Amino acid sequence: MTSQPSLPADDFDIYHVLAECTDYYDTLPVKEADGNQPHFQGVTGLWNLGNTCCVNAISQCLCSILPLVEYFLTGKYITALQKFLLPSDCSEVATAFAYLMTDMWLGDSDCVSPEIFWSALGNLYPAFTKKMQQDAQEFLICVLNELHEALKKYHYSRRRSYEKGSTQRCCRKWITTETSIITQLFEEQLNYSIVCLKCEKCTYKNEVFTVFSLPIPSKYECSLRDCLQCFFQQDALTWNNEIHCSFCETKQETAVRASISKAPKIIIFHLKRFDIQGTTKRKLRTDIHYPLTNLDLTPYICSIFRKYPKYNLCAVVNHFGDLDGGHYTAFCKNSVTQA
């Protein structure tokens, strides 16, 4: 899902990018394919190389995200890769991904092969090269992690902090952060408030991630909002789930509540349909309803960071089958054709 406000299709200068790369200046970049059928750039199929539907579905969704496409088509990734003195596995993944995006947006074919990209990632994760069903969420996380590792830059900043003592003393510390096109687009941060139910002292913990996994609260039917409310409701951790309290200096029952302290430009939801409990595994077939536009995350934003984010749907990965086998497909909104 992409954040609003909803802007024209050329927000990320994609028409200018396509024009520079292909020398076409039509209102919509269209090529005549075989059979006199129009071929829209960015609307390109991927060959199934033998149970690679997971790879193809994720690639199609990433291909529909304009700022990511613009970053690779304009060659900005090359500058980021130049920090490597020697070729690395993650730089090969980034280069292969760039070639795939180029084929899908600037190529003449109705269908192209993802083999180079698939092989580059398979060198790092051999499990993905096996002729068996893979998990789309795991594949997506691996792709985003490798792209981030290849393209990241280091930023150094000085932040003010206070040391406890008889008198509080202000000091400045250097903070190192890593940023990339991946963190700029997809990174989200959750803030957990953890309250000890004995001393009632509160501590905070932050968690950063790119894929937001949501529980499914109903067996039959629910909405995406129901999934969000289930995730953000306050949880009581008791018995074997007690957390160590630094004030009581022992494990105590606690109340934990999460809120969003950094909302991403593009949010990725993973619906936890695969349920494994002990030796029992199953797929939840709950019907989940979600809005196409104006998904409002305001109720879940940390109050001091409130920015009223709203999101429009841009792509969905579907899975047909069960845990042992099935097929992945993708529905994507093309940012150029708006279809």
Curated annotation (Swiss-Prot):
Domain USP: 44-339
Compartmental location: Cytoplasm; Cytoplasm, Cytoskeleton, Microtubule organizing center, Centrosome; Nucleus
Superkingdom of origin organism: Eukaryota
Catalytic activity: Thiol-dependent hydrolysis of ester, thioester, amide, peptide and isopeptide bonds formed by the C-terminal Gly of ubiquitin (a 76-residue protein attached to proteins as an intracellular targeting signal)
One term of GO molecular function: ubiquitin-like protein peptidase activity
Record keywords, A-Z: Cell cycle, Cytoplasm, Cytoskeleton, Hydrolase, Nucleus
Enzyme Commission number(s): 3.4.19.12
Active-site positions on this chain: C53 (nucleophile), H327 (proton acceptor)
InterPro entries: Papain-like_cys_pep_sf, Peptidase_C19_UCH, Ub_carboxyl-term_hydrolase, USP_CS, USP_dom
GO BP terms, alphabetized: endosome organization; nuclear speck organization; positive regulation of interleukin-1 beta production; positive regulation of interleukin-18 production; positive regulation of NLRP3 inflammasome complex assembly; protein deubiquitination; Ras protein signal transduction; regulation of cell cycle G2/M phase transition
Tissue specificity note: Weakly expressed in a few tissues.
The UniProt record lists the keyword Transmembrane helix: no
Gene Ontology cellular-component terms listed: centrosome; cytoplasm; cytosol; midbody; nucleus; postsynaptic density
Top-rank EC class of the record's enzyme: hydrolase
Family according to the record: Belongs to the peptidase C19 family.
Protein function: Deubiquitinating enzyme that removes conjugated ubiquitin from specific proteins to regulate different cellular processes. Regulates the inflammasome signaling pathway by deubiquitinating 'Lys-63'-linked polyubiquitination of the PYCARD/ASC adapter protein. Regulates the ubiquitination and stability of the ACE2 protein. Acts as a negative regulator of the G2/M checkpoint pathway, by preventing serine/threonine kinase WEE1 degradation, thereby repressing entry into mitosis following activation of the G2/M DNA damage checkpoint.
Remarks, miscellaneous: Vitamin C blocks the USP50-ACE2 interaction and thereby promotes ACE2 degradation and restricts SARS-CoV-2 entry.
Protein name, as recorded: Ubiquitin carboxyl-terminal hydrolase 50
Gene: USP50
